[in-house]
């Protein structure tokens, strides 16, 4: 039978064909409605013209034509709305059919995966992956510790100097100026063996002096 009457159309093709027919019908209705609206404007203009001329019989006849024309316009609008509603329903059916086809494909893919997956083998692979990950994490931690031991003190000192310089720059000072204004230590840091160390100014005194200078700058 199909060879005599052609290939049987699929549901998707039938939906597309009906959708095209509905769209064509809506375009035809729009054109006819626009024609009637133009005719309505012409009738109104003729009614005004006849009324000015005092031809009331003609005015009454054309008024009836105007009422009929407006009713037709309203019917065309309602008809187009109904066709558009049907078109939307067809579009919904098409979307639902596409969703069903997609779900069907996903179901087949999931069934194939379930048949191919071998749980014991996957568990073994995951255990080996976790073990190798732990070894890599341990090696990375040891390497980071070694690098921190080699470079940590220097980095900390550089960061501290940078912070101090930034603070002094914001206050309009330099680190060399403040250090030169600090009290002298009065000798080297080391003391010879058997020699009594001389009294040194405490660090607290130096900090207090620096703090007092900063406070004076803020008041200025």
UniProtKB/Swiss-Prot annotation:
Membrane-spanning intervals of the chain: none
InterPro entries: Snf7_fam
Region spans: Disordered: 184-220
Domain of life: Eukaryota
Chain segments annotated as coiled-coil in the UniProt record: 12-53
Pfam families, per database record: Snf7
Subcellular localization: Late endosome membrane; Cytoplasm
Ranges of Basic and acidic residues composition bias in the record: 211-220
Membrane topology, record value: Peripheral membrane protein
A biological process term (GO) from this entry: late endosome to vacuole transport
Quaternary state and interactors: Probable core component of the endosomal sorting required for transport complex III (ESCRT-III). ESCRT-III components are thought to multimerize to form a flat lattice on the perimeter membrane of the endosome.
Official protein name in the record: Charged multivesicular body protein 2a
Provenance organism: Danio rerio (Zebrafish)
């Amino acid at each position: 039978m199909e060879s005599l009457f052609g290939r049987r159309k699929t549901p998707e093709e039938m939906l597309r064909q009906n959708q095209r027919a509905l769209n064509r019908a809506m375009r035809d209705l729009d054109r006819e409605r626009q024609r009637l609206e133009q005719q309505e404007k012409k009738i109104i203009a003729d009614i005004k013209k006849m009324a000015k001329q005092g031809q009331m019989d003609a005015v009454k006849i054309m008024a009836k034509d105007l009422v009929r024309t407006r009713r037709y316009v309203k019917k065309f609008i309602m008809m187009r709305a109904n066709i558009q509603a049907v078109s939307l329903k067809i579009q919904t059916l098409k979307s639902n059919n596409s969703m069903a086809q997609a779900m069907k494909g996903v179901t087949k893919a999931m069934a194939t995966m379930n048949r191919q997956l071998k749980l014991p083998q996957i568990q073994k692979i995951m255990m080996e992956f976790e073990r190798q990950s732990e070894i890599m994490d341990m090696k990375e931690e040891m390497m980071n510790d070694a690098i921190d031991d080699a470079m940590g003190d220097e980095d900390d000192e550089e960061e501290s100097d940078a912070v101090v310089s930034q603070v002094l720059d914001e206050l309009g000072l330099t680190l060399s100026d403040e250090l030169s204004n600090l009290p002298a230590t009065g000798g080297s840091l080391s003391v010879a063996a058997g020699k009594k160390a001389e009294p040194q100014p405490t660090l607290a005194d130096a900090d207090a002096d620096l703090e007092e200078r900063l406070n004076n700058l803020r008041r200025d």
